[in-house]
Amino acid sequence: RDCTPSRGLGDVYKRQLTCSHAIIIPIQCEYYALEGLSQLLNTFRLVQRHLNKKLVIGGVLMTMYDSRLNLSKQVVEEVKSYFKDKLFKTLIYRNVKLSEAPSFGKPALLYDASSNGAKNYLSLTEEILQRVI
């Protein structure tokens, strides 16, 4: 289930982590995303220590990547230095079709399967399956 920090890190979020085996942490390639990450990691450690000792970070996903921006590259390098092999190789690039899809009530693959954004998520799916299998 998608549980973004904007939805709160309260009791519901902690319960969801307690019932999970692994989490995937999406991080936007923006400066302030790194600040929110510390709060998420604190909650993760709290749940792992007291409620679900088997909880692991299944992967870290970089989103809204823009190869034209130095900031995107810097954020990826910062995250890579901390998470190392947990960082997915797949990057989710900033893509207009990904932004449009929710306003049409559709996931990216149903909205435009040929878009680069949809292809990024298909690549991520393959990478996740390789890690799990």
Each language-model region and where it sits:
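P-loop/Walker-type NTP enzyme "switch/lid" segment
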Residues: 1, 51, 55, 101-104
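Short, solvent-exposed loop/helix junctions and linker helices
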Residues: 6, 34, 69, 114-118
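Proline-centered helix-kink/hinge sites
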Residues: 5-7, 26-29, 102, 107
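C-terminal boundary of histidine-terminating zinc-finger modules
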Residues: 102-119
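Nucleotide phosphate-binding site architecture
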Residues: 93, 99, 109
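Conserved catalytic-core segment of NTP-binding enzymes
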Residues: 10-96
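C-terminal alpha-helix
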Residues: 123-132
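Single conserved hydrophobic/aromatic residue that forms the stacking wall/gate
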Residues: 1-9, 13
